[in-house]
């Protein structure tokens, strides 16, 4: 056992980040159930449960969480990515007696994804007999507090192409998929990777 607390910090940081990721995974499962059953405010649809199942959501760790350097007083910085689940090709899909697989529009993805994020946040941070697990902070997302809580990969790409500032590219250095859809998280990581390294050629990148 290491006797020096300072030497232990990298290991502790990794374990805390992994614990936060597991908590977010659990909170997302709770959120999916709540939203599907109509327990939260907002979305109302005849096929509500099916709509929730038709949405992929990935949680991207940022800052200390993304870098696996979390400490006991850190916020858990995240951004959220959504996408419609691609309906599986089945022989009977859409035939008489079989309902067609639900394919969500981008607006529907945004609506349902936002509901899921609100429910997830309540599960982790809401008042309860036990203290909140973590302060989950999504303010590193594009446009900060003024921006939408969830975006598609394509929406993130357009933002980073057109409007992102140098510090936002620097923040992406620590971005890491930590919960939710692993496939969607990997797609987000592949999409933003070029921006991280190409941004070094931008004017005043080092000074910022």
Regions found by a protein language model. Name each.
Residues 1-208:
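A nucleotide- and high-energy phosphate-metabolite-utilizing enzyme signature
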